[in-house]
Amino acid sequence: MLFKENPFYLLSVHSTDGAAAIDAALSHQRKLLPREAEGASSEAAHWLLRMENRSEAEYFWPSGLPRRDAFLLAEGGESDCALSPRLRLLRFLNALSEDTLRLEALLSAEEDFLALSPLEALEDIQKDRRIAGFPAFKEPWVIEGYQQALILEIGSGAIAASRRLPEEERRRLLIALAKQGRRGMLYTQLLSAYERDVEKERAQLENDIAYALMISQKHPQQGRSLLAEKSRRYLSLSMPLYAMSGCWVLRPVFSSIRNRAIELSERLGRETGKRWFSLLEELFAFVPVFAKEIREDQVRLSCGEKLPRGKEGISQKDRLEIPRHISEIPHVKLEKGDRRWGIVVVIVLALAFLLFGR
């Protein structure tokens, strides 16, 4: 429940106001508002005068603060009073609908989650009830339910705010949170939402990469060019997941490219292998484990040693889906390692002409 949806705010009353003040506020609004708008004010008054409903409004209101500071906070201002974790989280929740996510605010919210206390909220509510003349709150266990609702609302609001960020900024924010080591409830919700949002594109890119590896068997240059393009996008999308979980997120793609590099170096020669391992290094050098493997492979390749293949990374389907959005494979000039196949073709054609052309 946001401040501006709260019955206290709708009636312009505070949690220290009694039944008479609530009735007076309702009468005042009825004089000012058109008849069709009276329903919301009447419902707000009914909510505050029924004790079983009132407690929720009290929890999501700056109860415990003086009237001036409470309304200042509700309007988005800064109170001079020291705020409890609950009130700081309420302020954070209300800012999410208008503000962009900031790293400092998220880190503070994670700390406030840990310090959130049902007893502190209960004390604020009971104090204001005594001033208002309402009976004491007799079911303190209900506060824990409101606390969970607050956490869920903040999670939903933060996810919505993260989706409004530019794509690159959203990824940077998640990576920064992971590097801070603050992997609490809020961070987990944000990362899970991001993973769901990019799941479809990552799956498509994995298929594109498998397609590029497939065509590289007959067209190494074109396959490598397409592979570089699709892998860069895949790695960009995967960086927040890598920051959280480590290299295993990228291992399938890395292993598939490495195995193809080994296969092509054995079939087409060392120069082709060097170019493929150079691409592998360009893509994955930021991962220490992969960088070490690539360096070791490059040394073995230079020495003419046989390179051990790893497990196949990307799961092979019975029938590879040919991407519809790839209209043609990239056109590239033949490099040194591929020219010999052209020479072989010319020689074969010449022999055929000599044998059968006469």
Model-derived features: positions:
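Intrinsically disordered, low-complexity regions enriched in small/polar residues
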Residues: 10, 136, 148, 355-358
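Amphipathic alpha-helical protein-interaction segments
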Residues: 22-23, 40, 44, 64-335
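Alpha-helical transmembrane anchor segments and their immediate juxtamembrane flanks
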Residues: 335-358
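N-terminal J-domain/J-like co-chaperone modules of DnaJ/Hsp40 proteins
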Residues: 1-36, 40, 44-47, 53-55, ...
